[in-house]
Amino acid sequence: MQAKTAMMAAVALLAVGGLAPLAAKQTAVDYSAALASSERPGDDTVRDADRQPAAILAFAGVKPGSRIVELAPGGGYYTRILSLAVGPNGRIYTRTSRLGQAVATWAATHGNTSPGVVTAASASLAPEPVDIVWTTLNYHDFKIIKVEGGDFAIVANRLAFAALKPGGVYLVNDHDGAKGTGTSQTDTLHRIEMAGVIAEVEAAGFKLDAQSDVLRHPGDDHTTRVTETGIRGKTDQFVLRFRKPAKRR
């Protein structure tokens, strides 16, 4: 199991190497120990081949000691990986509309993980500036949640920008929609067109730094609900790395 995980991690680093020039300048981080940890449930590890977590962590620049806000952690698949990857000197702040049991259970035995609630009225995402704000397969859901003045995606982008250190990373991964569909399928197929996400996040002050094709699936025609048998785990997904502009000297 450990040998297989190490091989997946090495392949993942090669997979993103040509897509993320800034990441290539950084010292490569070995995520194999985190991914092979016996603390991860079996239901998580069987999903690794589809979700390519080592590649996504490398693309985002996750490393020991990183401070990360994870928006909408769901069942905690990435919460557990991120917590193990950043180690005892790092910090994971999970933020969602309601606290989930899976994340709460993990946090109870892992002091580097701090669950919390975020709403449209929240003033901040974390008690300190963070290196990365992370959301996977949730941005389309943010568009469904309506708040005063628009939808929760606008709130999430604003809070993410405020939470990040200058030069920090906003990692957005979601199921892509067909060209021209925009946000029309967020509540039906649970897809969102990448072009609109880029425009919206950049309007919040971010700059698109790079995108990874590691979760691209050309065989997905973008017409099927993402939870349908046969497509689940094999959807065509975009992975975008935005940066908060660094302060000018």
Residue ranges and their predicted role:
Residues P64-G65, P88-N89, L164-Y170:
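Short glycine-dipeptide loop
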Residues P64-G74:
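Conserved class I S-adenosyl-L-methionine
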Residues S83-L84, E148-P166:
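A short glycine-rich, Lys/Arg-flanked "PGG" loop and its adjoining helix->strand segment in the class I
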Residues Q101-P127:
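S-adenosyl-L-methionine
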Residues S124-L137:
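A short acidic, Gly/Pro-enriched loop at the edge of an enzyme's catalytic core
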Residues G182-D209:
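Conserved Class I S-adenosyl-L-methionine
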Residues D221-R249:
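Core SAM-dependent methyltransferase catalytic element
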